[in-house]
Amino acid sequence: MARALQIRGTFGAGSERSLGCKGAEGVMVGLVVVGLGDVGSSILAGIEAARAHLVHPWGSLVEAGGAGRKPEHGGSQPLRLAAPFANLSDLALGAFELKEDDAYRAALRAGHVSRSLVDELRPQLRHIRAMSGARQAPTRRHLADALAEDLRGFAEHNGCPRGVVVCTVPGLRELSGKPLFSPVDLWDALEASGPEVSPALVYAAAAARAGYGFVAAAPDAALEAPAVAELFGNSDVPFAGVGLLSPDAALREALQQVMDSEALGLVGATSLTTRAEERGARLWGGPDRTEEMGLAAAWAGGSFEISVQMRGQISLHHAARAVDAALLCELAQRAGRSGAQTWMSALFATSPAAASPHDAPAATLRERRERLRAELPVLAAAALASSQAA
């Protein structure tokens, strides 16, 4: 475990140049990335590239919406037009890492962002240094307390009244210890350094203690415990979700809708998708692709074979979604939300355990996206009221 970066990056002009709904300009927001692997380095390099106006932030629902297409042609407007999100230029970027590293070296090592772009961003990325310091602590509770102190120092140094931690490190596939039903159970598990405590759970506890919102980019069974959502609720900060969705999830749902509209029955399907939580998984489906294969039943006993291949780097998609989740989480915090943010389930494979069991997420991804968009005006009004009261 390492100390947080306490150096503010060099900011570009921001991404608010064509936006209809302006955020809280001039108010710094801390964004601390845990892990400078493929996803973590892509988050930081992408933000720096976008706010330096070197690239357009394609892939981000908040910044780019439906890939530039007009709504009447199947596109969607950027979420930023519906609510006062923080500007990319107002993000103070930080990182945690196990060894001494910086965002420039991490981006070169990952190799997902083009070398020419990374070199052009070298001054900004070199400033984002994750301090080494896998510290010796008697228990993981003491470690969480130390990390929380680093987060407070980061916020104070950069003048950030709010912040979000985005954890990209892989978590537990399944729990091996007892379930955590309350914050008391969680702190007891941290004190005992039990098997049910993952690294992400330590960072989550630190974030809650320091007053930061939390986004778990990778799946982690430890973070699905009811105690985690309750901990963030008690700390008055939001907990976004666990395990960012890959685009193949949306593709499968779209294909299913087409098959339903054409009265084709799905007989069987095979997915060769690489698990997103594998930190070294550079691409979908083995070396260079994901392949989705299915068999659809047709008229008179016939069938159609459906095969879809997607080529690309999964970390770039997850980086864009992580930025979306962080900006939504910060907006929720500004609007006075805390605990499980089930309305953000459209971005995640697992919605955090809600306080109300009946508050189940919508069934389809489309319904969840509609719920997220419907929540934005409510958040915008609450954030505005909060700023006026302050």
Sequence positions of predicted segments:
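Serine residues within intrinsically disordered or low-complexity segments
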Residues: 15-18
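Short, surface-exposed basic-aromatic patches at helix termini and helix-loop junctions that form
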Residues: 26, 205-213, 224-238, 254-263
